[in-house]
Amino acid sequence: MKRFALSLLAGLVALQASAATPDRLTIVNQYVDNVLTKAGDHYHGQSPTPLLADGVDPRTGKQMEWIFPDGRHAVLSNFSAQQNLMRVLVGLSNLSGNPSYKQRAEAIVKYHFQHYQDESGLLIWGGHRFVDLKTLQPEGPSEKEMVHELKNAYPYYDLMFSVDKDATARFIRGFWNAHVYDWKIMETSRHGKYGQKIGALWQSPFEQQPPFFATKGLSFLNAGNDLIYSASLLYKYNKEDGALVWAKRLAQQYVLPRDKATGLGVYQFTQALKRDETTDDADTHSKYGDRAQRQFGPEFGPTALEGNMMLKGRTSTIYSENALMQLQLGKDLGAEGKELLTWTTDGLKAFAKYAYNESDNTFRPMLANGKDLSNYVLPRDGYYGKKGTVIKPYPADNSFLLSYARAYTVLPDAELWRVARGIARAQGLGELGSAPGKDVKVDLATKNNDPYALFALLDLYQASKVKDYLSLAEKVGDNIISTRYQNGFFMAEPNRQYADVDTIEPYALLALEAAVRNQPQSVAPFLNGAGFTEGGYRMEDGSTRVSTRDNEIFLLNVGETLKPNNKK
């Protein structure tokens, strides 16, 4: 009897605790309502626009501002930096049955097409353009010449096509038109000019160039990713065959220069055209030629090029952002996406083989030819750091866990699994098993609260249906709520000044809820996209801090201000 009473009491306590803790869908619902209320348009009386601020102080409701060098303030509303939120709004409607959230996302898309699409099709968004929510006027840092730029943004084209197919197609054509400087040789650039007349586009002639040919435009993969993704979606939704031809052609440009022995690379398929001379190693303008060759060439020879630098940050673009995007396209495009899957999984296997240190869960900094740069001391100033800087191995974090887990669901390869398993173990998730479902011993007491880990576990669960992975995902989800849900917003640290409305914690929680309900299609696949704003920012002393990024403002705690970055 006593045992029964204790059991009953324990059950009642658990029931009360459960009742006192809102479920994850309720939490996301509360969060989204807070975003729509506090980050909304408070400036236009009875006729507010549907637009949103990028950031908000959860405690006061103050919306995050950009301060221009001339002292003007603007409430930052950059639609390219709200694309995860758009996916959250649609997913929340799908799971809750409340259509108002999806309708708000649709209204935001429609408003941008109506008010901020130029004659060439480009939108006012991206790294150097945004809308001031107070005035509704387009803004941008003047020193960047107000150019168009997307880097790993991955706009929610599925939503955009559903709202206005023609306007979305116009944007994608205009995007390629502005960023491909020379179609014949595939010279691309991260910067595109607004208002350009549309050229031949997909009908343009093309001649394959040798790896790392010299161009003025810089073929950074983070910019190429968005071009590849957009043209592929244009093919998917508008059946423009030429768009897919050019999307795959561009993707292949980053594959052809891979090192023939290792299969590693590349971050760029061109090198900067040398147009001027300098004796100042600290001046890293691309007009002086390839910046890796300037800094590493005397010691490592002609293969030391920017495209071959397998360093922290660059490898995230190649083996996380690009990998997730192309793996998804490969699935979506069926037979037409087979090459994308092969290129991506081949690259991930090469990176696993040559770069991953399982003993301490790090990646080696390398040249694409396999030269290990671990603990290398820079002999001169340059693009990759000041003289004396030591290049160190860097942690294999949960974003890499996600790309390797997702790749394994496409290609069950032992090398891919080895890396996913090793990262999971190092990230406190326990033992994923010698294979999915075999020798599994996950840690259901984990303190891991990383949404990337949650997404990775959901990928493994969807592919294997091993319940342990879903249980572990639920634990990570609980940790996210208990540690990152602060004052009605999600923040990595509770003392941050501003909450980012595009943060991915609610996205991960919605994906978890969808998996638990066996409705994974209700939430858009996670691609690890994110927009940004960058430019000159006025400091408190009146000086201009060049190349300031919005994420630096999001990292400030209450009472902190930006410190000089000493960039020129």
Curated annotation (Swiss-Prot):
Gene Ontology cellular-component annotations: periplasmic space
Location in the cell: Periplasm
Positions in coiled-coil regions: none
One function term, GO molecular function aspect: pectate lyase activity
GO biological process: pectin catabolic process
Signal sequence annotation: 1-19
Pathway named in the protein's UniProt entry: Glycan metabolism; pectin degradation; 2-dehydro-3-deoxy-D-gluconate from pectin: step 2/5
Pfam families (UniProt xref): Pectate_lyase_2
UniProt-listed Gene3D superfamilies: 1.50.10.20, 2.30.30.880, 3.90.105.40
UniProt keyword terms in alphabetical order: Lyase, Periplasm, Signal
Family annotation (InterPro entries): Pectate_lyase_2
Reaction catalyzed: Eliminative cleavage of (1->4)-alpha-D-galacturonan to give oligosaccharides with 4-deoxy-alpha-D-galact-4-enuronosyl groups at their non-reducing ends
EC numbers, comma separated: 4.2.2.2
Keyword Signal: yes
Protein family per UniProt: Belongs to the polysaccharide lyase 2 family.
Protein name, as recorded: Periplasmic pectate lyase
Organism: Pectobacterium carotovorum subsp. carotovorum (Erwinia carotovora subsp. carotovora)
Gene it is expressed from: pelB
